[in-house]
UniProtKB/Swiss-Prot annotation:
Protein name per its UniProtKB record: Muscleblind-like protein 1
Keyword Secreted attached: no
GO molecular function term, any single one: double-stranded RNA binding
Entry keywords, A to Z: Corneal dystrophy, Cytoplasm, Disease variant, Metal-binding, mRNA processing, mRNA splicing, Nucleus, Phosphoprotein, Repeat, RNA-binding, Zinc, Zinc-finger
Tree of life domain: Eukaryota
Tissue specificity: Highly expressed in cardiac, skeletal muscle and during myoblast differentiation. Weakly expressed in other tissues (at protein level). Expressed in heart, brain, placenta, lung, liver, skeletal muscle, kidney and pancreas.
Organism: Homo sapiens (Human)
Length: 388
């Protein structure tokens, strides 16, 4: 998507403040030492500021009486730094405009605001944080976003970055979660409610000062619901029995939801702690092979689903199985036959057991109550591969 940004020639980075003492003729510093400009009579000074000659910075100004300032070396260095910062800002603003158009393409209903081109000078004050400017944009320097295009109202960004929620809507949603408020009957306020106080599903407060004019609700006296309000003139609403049951049911639902959320959070924390404490099973332990013989295998990733299935092809499992197969083909390990150990048996039984053990070609004859010792050289000389 091509984005054309027309650069506007900006002379703010070439602007220098004129020395007021020099204008009065009382500056004791020469122009090569004063941090302010000492312009000549041919230079144009507006509002105590003068524009430096761009050609003079390049060393190619050939005008006899130039109306722009030819700065001394120390001011020239400052202007060169300002020029580099201006170029960086122009590139950043071009990227900013491109990202805004991309964001507008993703949200067709949102209007695209024009981005003015402006520069950053050391004398300009930085604006507020630009993080709330657009959720699709990365961290941008606060000076790159002008104050007139920043949102004035505080914004809350939801999980979908393209749908920012105003703070007023979030506050309204928070008020709806409160169980100590009841909506006032509008017909009762007009004097047209045919239902009585004990039949209407809305509140009929006797005192209009209890009503919150922002959302037309009244705050319920929780002490009255618990049967312990002793105020002579309570500023909170004392609801009838059917509205008390409604409030108690809402409180029960909120408490149940909070308990379920706390249980889910605790379970997630416990599961993460168990996963962090689990030690992956070594492949050398699975095969009964010394660790010095085999190279380390890649770790086998655990499946995330509880049913043991995965919906996508996992390259980590494939690498683990391939490394395991290569290990079986390349490393020739010995097959260790089972040697029976019979504790408390008769000599005849032990001799029968050792006879079965000595039937293996490479096993040495074992005496009673002894395990045949096989050297590592003998194991490597016989090519027996373990059966997987």
């Amino acid at each position: 998507m091509a984005v054309s940004v027309t650069p506007i020639r900006d002379t703010k980075w070439l602007t220098l403040e004129v020395c007021r003492e020099f204008q009065r003729g009382t500056c004791s510093r020469p122009d090569t030492e004063c941090k302010f400009a000492h312009p000549s009579k041919s230079c144009q000074v507006e509002n105590g500021r003068v524009i430096a000659c761009f050609d003079s910075l390049k060393g190619r100004c050939s005008r006899e009486n130039c109306k722009y300032l030819h700065p001394p070396p120390h001011l020239k260095t400052q202007l060169e730094i300002n020029g580099r910062n201006n170029l960086i800002q122009q590139k950043n603003m071009a990227m900013l405009a491109q990202q805004m158009q991309l964001a507008n393409a993703m949200m067709p209903g949102a209007p695209l605001q024009p981005v003015p081109m402006f520069s950053v000078a050391p004398s300009l004050a930085t604006n507020a944080s630009a993080a709330a400017f657009n959720p699709y944009l990365g961290p941008v320097s606060p000076s790159l976003v002008p104050a007139e295009i920043l949102p004035t109202a505080p914004m809350l960004v939801t999980g979908n970055p393209g749908v920012p929620v105003p703070a007023a809507a979030a506050a309204a949603a928070q008020k709806l979660m409160r169980t100590d408020r009841l909506e006032v009957c509008r017909e009762y306020q007009r004097g047209n409610c045919n239902r009585g106080e004990n039949d209407c599903r809305f509140a009929h407060p006797a005192d209009s000062t209890m009503i919150d004019t922002n959302d037309n609700t009244v705050t319920v006296c929780m002490d009255y619901i618990k049967g312990r309000c002793s105020r002579e003139k309570c500023k909170y609403f004392h609801p009838p029995a059917h509205l008390q049951a409604k409030i108690k049911a809402a409180q029960y639902q909120v408490n149940q939801a909070a308990a379920a959320q706390a249980a889910a959070t605790a379970a997630a924390m416990t599961q993460s702690a168990v996963k962090s404490l689990k030690r992956p099973l070594e492949a050398t332990f699975d095969l009964g092979i010394p660790q010095a013989v085999l190279p380390p295998l890649p770790k086998r990733p655990a499946l995330e689903k509880t049913n043991g299935a995965t919906a996508v092809f996992n390259t980590g499992i494939f690498q683990y199985q391939q490394a395991l197969a290569n290990m079986q083909l390349q490393q020739h390990t010995a097959f260790l036959p089972p040697v029976p150990m019979v504790h408390g048996a008769t000599p005849a039984t032990v001799s029968a057991a050792t006879t079965s053990a000595t039937s293996v070609p490479f096993a040495a004859t074992a005496t009673a109550n002894q395990i045949p010792i096989i050297s590592a050289e003998h194991l490597t000389s016989h090519k027996y591969v373990t059966q997987m």
